[in-house]
Curated annotation (Swiss-Prot):
Assembly mode: Heterotetramer of two alpha and two beta chains.
Protein name as annotated: Arginine biosynthesis bifunctional protein ArgJ
Record bears the keyword Cytoplasm: yes
Residue numbers binding substrate: T166, K189, T200, E280, N399, S404
Phylogenetic placement of the source organism: Bacteria, Bacillati, Actinomycetota, Actinomycetes, Mycobacteriales
Pathway where this protein functions: Amino-acid biosynthesis; L-arginine biosynthesis; L-ornithine and N-acetyl-L-glutamate from L-glutamate and N(2)-acetyl-L-ornithine (cyclic): step 1/1; Amino-acid biosynthesis; L-arginine biosynthesis; N(2)-acetyl-L-ornithine from L-glutamate: step 1/4
Annotated signal sequence range: none
Amino acid sequence: MTETVNAARLLREQGVTAPAGFRAAGIAAGIKASGKRDLALVFNEGPDYGAAGVFTRNKVKAAPVLWSQQVLTTGALRAVILNSGGANACTGPGGFQDAHATAEAVAAALSDWGTETGAIEVAVCSTGLIGDRLPMDKLLAGVRTIVQDMAGGLSGGDDAAQAIMTTDTVPKQVALHHPGNWTVGGMAKGAGMIAPSLATMLCVLTTDAAVDPVALDTALRRATAATFDRLDIDGACSTNDTVLLLASGASGITPAQADLDDAVLRVCDDLCAQLQADAEGVTKRVNVTVTGAASDDDAVVAARTIARDSLVKTAVFGSDPNWGRVVAAVGIAPIALDPDRMTVSFNGSAVFADGVGTPGAREVDLSGPDIDITVDLRLGDGRATVRTTDLSHGYVEENSAYSS
């Protein structure tokens, strides 16, 4: 897909290696029983090494999250190592030592390769089943191999995006080429256990802009607040959620903060749309928009309440324009509202107004794959959109058998 907005090019055929100064790789290290790729590496060749990150708000944090939070206090990263096939969560002190050992192994391999690196410059990310220790013999052997396999260009980024997949059916990546001759790229994984506070989601973003860690942190937090934090597939918040942004400075260009913010936002928004489209068991993509709220915060709360409601999601799955479920859902949100003032629309067709259903509301066609639910509270200027999906038989079947 190619899109031109404000002369910037957004390309889904490219990812983390689109910006200058980055290499990546993805290999099969034997962590997954399937034999598919399960280990990815993203390497920043510099000359700058600024980095920022946001992590899960779940109080139960996986070992790699705890490790990566520590290393990011320096505001610099040379590499990110990511594995699928095991979350390394709820694994105690031994699990944290495994994360540390992984970073040490990456640092040693990169140093042997010719780039002096310390473990403090390596972030670690894991995704998969909670509760099991990682097969460290396979993982550490894979680290030694993957450093030798690093590539620039598109192939390395493609392989890395495939290696972080779990229940995903397709890799997710995108790059934005700014007309000012700098680029932002990214890859993400996630298909379930996705809720605000990020998602069961690993995401690595890269840029060749010459920007400091403070600017990166500002751009990343603004972007995630408006995108990943408003993606709610199943209301479940993972222990491993991680979004990292690395800057190589290889373009030599320092964009204005507003331009950096916009580019990172657009890349995150596109990745968010890809996550929504590939959610577990999804048959319909649903955007819930609340307008006219007393504040933007109230709008987010209301939209999220609707997006998480199982009865709303199952009605959408059945193509049932059941506006009563939407009204009931928003009615329990802890916000100000007047049911006699608010309106509800499905795909632009009004189905509820003045406290009652509208004529023809039950005939609105929801058979298509994209559904827009809009609730106007008519109280103020607050507005927010939350992405979600329907709740299908496929979702239940996939998650009931996940650990086996």
